[in-house]
Amino acid sequence: IVQGEGLLLKGGNVHTADPEGVQKNTDIYIKDGKIIKIGKDLQVDASRVEDLNGKIVTPGFIAPYSQLGIVEIEAVAETRDDRSTVYSSGLSIVSAFNPHSTLIPYNLRGGITTTLSVPSSSGLYSGLASSFSLSSSLEGSLISRDIALFGSVSSGEGSRAAKMLLLEDSLDVASRVIEANGWNDEKGLPSSSSYSSRDIIALKRVLSREIPLVVRADRASDILF
C-alpha cells in the first residue's frame, strides 16, 4: 500500500482478541499500515477495495521461538549471528537483527508478523531473547529487548549432570554478587567456565525476577530437577 492510501477489506470473518470473538461479514479499513476501523458496511474513502468473500482474517501470528533475523543459512557460519564464544547468559542479539532477511517475506506470507528471536548455544546458556516486528523497517523492528534468558540442560555438548550443576553454581555466584552489591570474582565456578560481568548481570536480572529463565528440558528428570 502506498503511504497515505487506504485499503478497505470487505466481508471477512474477523477473529479478534476481544470477548466477542469472531465478527462475521466484517470490514477492515487500513491506512499507512495501521488498522483504522473495524465494522460492518464501513463507509470510508479508500483508494483500494478488496472483497474477502467470507475469508478468515486473524491478528498476525507470533513465532515464539525462532532465529528469524539472526540466522540466514544454518550451514554458513558467516550468516549466523545467534551464538558467541565470548558471552553466554549475557549475549544480546538485538544489534545483529536483520530486518531485511530473505526469510522474513516468506514468513510474512504465512501470517507471521512478530518473532521472539532466541540465540543458540551448545552450552548451558544461549543468551537473551528479544521480540521483533517483521515490518522490514530498521527503525521500527524492535518491540522488546532482552526479555528472557534462554538455556538448555538437555541439548548440545557436555553432560546433563554437569550442566545442571553449572546452573546451580552460576545462579549461586550471581546471588552472592547481589548480596555483596557488586562484582568480586567467580569463586564457586569451574575454572573451565568463564563468566563476564555482562553474563552475571543477566543472571542477576533472573534472580531479581526482572526476566524469566527459560530452560529446554527433554526428559522427565530434567523437569523434576
Residue locations for each model-derived region?
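Polyanionic/metal-chelating signatures
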Residues: 103, 108-225
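Soluble non-cytosolic domains of exported or imported proteins
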Residues: 24, 81, 85, 94-101, ...
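Catalytic metal-binding/acid-base residues of hydrolase active sites
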Residues: 15, 67-69, 121
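N-terminal post-signal-peptidase region of extra-cytosolic proteins
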Residues: 16, 45-48, 97-101, 117
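Boundary at the C-terminal end of the N-terminal hydrophobic targeting segment
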Residues: 2-6
